UniProtKB/Swiss-Prot annotation:
InterPro entries: ATPase_NBD, Carb_kinase_FGGY, FGGY_C, FGGY_N, Ribulokinase. Keywords: Arabinose catabolism, ATP-binding, Carbohydrate metabolism, Kinase, Nucleotide-binding, Transferase. The gene is araB. GO terms for biological process: L-arabinose catabolic process to xylulose 5-phosphate. This is Ribulokinase. It holds the Pfam family FGGY_C. Its EC number is 2.7.1.16. Gene3D superfamilies: 3.30.420.40. Pathway: Carbohydrate degradation; L-arabinose degradation via L-ribulose; D-xylulose 5-phosphate from L-arabinose (bacterial route): step 2/3. Belongs to the ribulokinase family.
């Protein structure tokens, strides 16, 4: 048997990336395809329908564009014979969901629905279902639902049930016309294979499914809304299969589009961050993997099911078969730094960066690195896009304290870097306090490759060594590993994801170690961060929510005046 290859496709927030990998984990070729429609958060394409605040949609056709463009590109770049590609795997943002009809066609592609926002793909960061999430949590808590502690006591507005309920409340006709609500990762697998299967990862983390108990009871859904009573056996029906399972094989039509052979094995869908865990070679407990990009997803393996405040979930076999997979997260990290660079930096910084031939991020990082911990006099709460863990509240907002007339842009930048590190420390503390050990940190994604200052701050704030993924596209490599498992040993692949990770997972030799004097200062700053965190985040002062409410009320009044 000659040399064999697998392809992993990572569907991110703004683009899709295909990576062609050999069975030793060497990356042979990669290609990024930006989504033509990007993130739709202001106006629907073609119809000019205005979207309300907190909406974030996507066009499902963009996902197919990635298959049609990126896969042929990596084959062409590498010169690899398509016959030597034994499997394809994908990972996706989640919960990114869409309504489809009985043939599997997204409702937004039908002429009668294209002007209706609720027919489109709801991206993971669509936060307009917060009212439904609040009521769901209130009812679940009153009923003493057993599932609630598994999700840190709160179900997020980002997840499947809240989003479905929002559709039912605001567009009941679209709900009625929907045959299935699908995770986008499962829909793309359906398009590739013709097989409609749901993966255990998104079902467990985003749809309140449990390996032993299944979905919550009909009685619970009836208590939410009588119209939801039969949701799980109708619009959420379908087999739920473990990660690493073969979903099916490429159809002739899709193989022709992608430049591969019909019959090529396709792994069940996965979540971007979760695919990154084997991507860095982590297949055992005690090693926290941080997938760092626009947001951070924190993943950890355990041998028991423990209840931890603010977790996105604990799911048996949810990341690596044989372990309980814990997920936590921060709703905005890279997005905060990008916001500051785009919206908050004075013109002279942009001009200076341009003159030096560096990006604004690099210019700020270089100057921020000259400061010692505490020297900026600033402290921030990293809630620019709400708080995912441990407070699970999208209505919280960002805060910076300590400004003076002498505050410089690089000081603000450093304070924002530090704030996200404190947010990660809060998550680590929650794990440890509830009996789930965190001994080592692993970082992957775009940020660790770009920002050394950020990684040193994380090492100092958490007082733990951080290992960095060797790959710049770890989730795609992880997805490729699952493709190797789906292909099977008989076709040159692997027996299990553990075997695949041991042979294909890689980290850099360079690590970031905590600097003791920095650790001591950050410990004091973290105590202050915790006071702010609890004061503004646990109900003592809900000023952030009141401000958000007044903002929305004022906007609504302004819009109604414009319409009249």
């Amino acid at each position: 048997m000659g040399k064999k290859y697998v392809i992993g496709i990572d569907y991110g927030t703004e683009s899709g990336r295909a990576v062609l990998v050999d069975l030793e984990g060497n990356e042979i070729a990669d290609h990024v395809t930006p989504y033509p429609h990007g993130v739709i958060d202001e106006v629907l394409p073609e119809s000019n329908v205005q979207l309300e605040p907190d909406w974030a949609l996507q066009h499902p056709g963009d996902y197919i564009e990635v298959l049609a463009t990126a896969v042929p590109a990596v084959l062409q770049k590498s010169g690899v014979n398509p016959a030597d590609v034994i499997g394809v795997g994908i990972d996706f943002t989640a919960c990114t969901m869409l309504p489809v009809d009985a043939s599997g066609e997204p409702l937004c592609l039908k002429p009668e629905f294209k002007h209706r926002p609720h027919s489109w793909v709801k991206l993971w960061k669509h936060h307009a279902a917060q009212d439904e999430a609040n009521l769901l949590n209130e009812i679940a808590a009153k009923r003493g639902e057993a599932f609630l502690p598994r999700y840190g006591g709160k179900i997020s507005s980002e997840w499947m049930i809240a989003k479905i309920w929002q559709i039912l409340n605001e567009a009941p006709d679209i709900y009625d016309q929907t045959d299935l609500f699908l995770e986008a990762t499962d829909w793309v697998i359906f398009k590739m294979t013709g097989q409609m299967v749901r993966n255990s990862c998104t079902a467990g983390y985003k749809s309140i499914w449990h390996k032993q108990d299944g979905y919550p009871s009909k009685e619970f859904f009836r208590a939410l809304d009588p119209r939801l009573e039969h949701l799980t056996e109708t619009k959420l029906r379908g087999p739920i299969v473990p990660l690493g399972t073969r979903a099916g094989v490429l159809t002739k039509e899709m193989a022709a589009m992608m430049g591969l052979l019909p019959g090529t094995a396709v792994a069940v869908g996965n979540v971007d961050a979760h695919a990154a865990v084997p991507g860095v070679g982590v297949v055992e407990p005690g090693k926290l993997v941080m997938a760092m990009g626009t947001s951070i997803c924190h993943m950890l393996l355990g041998t028991e099911e423990k209840y931890v405040e603010g977790m996105c979930g604990v799911v048996e076999d949810g990341i690596i078969p044989g372990y309980f997979g814990y997920e936590a997260g921060q709703s905005a990290v890279g997005d905060i730094f990008a916001w500051y660079v785009e919206q908050g930096v004075p013109a002279y910084v942009k001009e200076a960066a341009e003159k030096e031939g560096v990006s604004v991020h690099e210019w700020l990082e270089k100057r921020a690195a000259a400061y010692r911990p505490g020297e900026t006099g600033l402290l921030a709460l990293d809630w620019w896009n709400g708080n995912r863990s441990v407070l699970v509240d999208t209505d919280l907002t960002g805060l910076i304290i300590g400004y003076t007339l002498l505050t410089k842009p690089e000081e603000v930048y450093r304070a924002l870097l530090e704030a996200t590190a404190f947010g990660t420390r809060k998550i680590i503390d929650a794990f440890v306090e509830n009996g789930v050990n965190v001994d080592e940190l692993y970082a992957c994604g775009g940020l660790p490759q770009k920002n050394k200052l950020l990684m040193q701050i994380y090492a100092d704030v958490t007082n733990r060594e951080i290992k960095i993924a060797a790959s710049k596209q770890t989730p795609a490599v992880g997805a490729a590993m699952f493709a190797a498992v789906a292909a099977g040993k008989e076709n040159g692949g692997y027996e299990s994801i553990v075997e695949a990770a041991q042979n294909m997972g890689k980290v850099r030799e360079e690590t970031f170690k905590p600097i003791p004097e920095n650790v001591a200062i950050y410990e004091q700053l973290y105590q202050e961060y915790t006071k702010l965190h609890d004061y503004f985040g646990r109900g003592e002062n809900d000023v952030m929510k009141r401000l958000k409410h007044w903002k929305e009320t004022a906007r609504a009044a302004k819009e109604s005046m414009t319409l009249s």
